[in-house]
Amino acid sequence: MKEIFFAKNDLSNLEYSLNREVLRANVSNAYSCTTLPFCNTRKYHGLLIVPQPKIDNQNHVLLSSLDETINQNNNSFHLALHRYQNGVYSPKGHKYLESYELGLLPTHTYRIGSIVLLKQMFFQEKQDRLLIKYTLKEA
């Protein structure tokens, strides 16, 4: 099976990457839907969306996004990307994205100076649970 791969040029180009959505789901109907750089641009975007039969039988966004920060030598590097009114984006974490590979375990690779960080997100098969794994590959 050929894996889908996006390089830094694709990910740092917001006109391109914000128009590419990633959808992952499991058998319990939980799902994650967002753009390549994790910037939610639509109402239905989120990292963990789960049907709530005890409330109203509708899907609810339980986890919208994460605002991860890497601290190195008294400097903070924010990995998130949010879109605000008038086309303002902040913080600009997409500039640290090195690659995205969609395989069995989707992997975002971030590079901040000499640090290389892998971020993998996957669902437990039959539970409404999203697992996020970070691996420090180089430092």
Locate predicted features.
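Terminal accessory carbohydrate-recognition/targeting modules of carbohydrate-active enzymes
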Residues: 1-139
